[in-house]
């Protein structure tokens, strides 16, 4: 991510960004209830709401965001929640500080805004364990503006080519009536 974009997000976190609801989505709870705890990576974890939810459910959680202000807030929230988690600032297209593999990678609103999705998917392949799950939420393509956050058909083709199988897709709309979807992928058990 470029410096301007990083600064822009840090400034959002001086207040309350519209995407930081402080509420874990029902799709995350559904996953927790139907899968045994393991290692989870929250990509673009923001202020740590879902990191806390996963940790309370017995998951060993790592979370990162490229907005350092968000990570500062997340560390305070995790301390108040009295849970253990590893948090740091990182870039989803590099994941320099992420080590090991995870049974769950969670991405709520990160992938759709990443300019270099190929590098993101390369890193996802590195950190997602064979047989692991990628639970991802994002905006669907709705405009010809290439700078608008979105997931389009080319992205979905890249994801499939990466060896990820789409288990389910739930289309809907966000609060501002923008088309969005929850995607639930599983990585092949063999690589």
Question: Where are the predicted features?
Answer:
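Conserved class I S-adenosyl-L-methionine
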Residues: 1-35, 37-46
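Conserved SAM/SAH-binding beta-strand->alpha-helix loop
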Residues: 67-69
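Conserved SAM-binding loop
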Residues: 74-75
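Conserved SAM-binding strand-loop segment of SAM-dependent methyltransferases
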Residues: 81-93
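A conserved beta-strand element that flanks and buttresses the S-adenosyl-L-methionine
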Residues: 106
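A short glycine-rich, Lys/Arg-flanked "PGG" loop and its adjoining helix->strand segment in the class I
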Residues: 119-130
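Conserved beta-strand signature within the Rossmann-like core of class I S-adenosyl-L-methionine
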Residues: 131-139
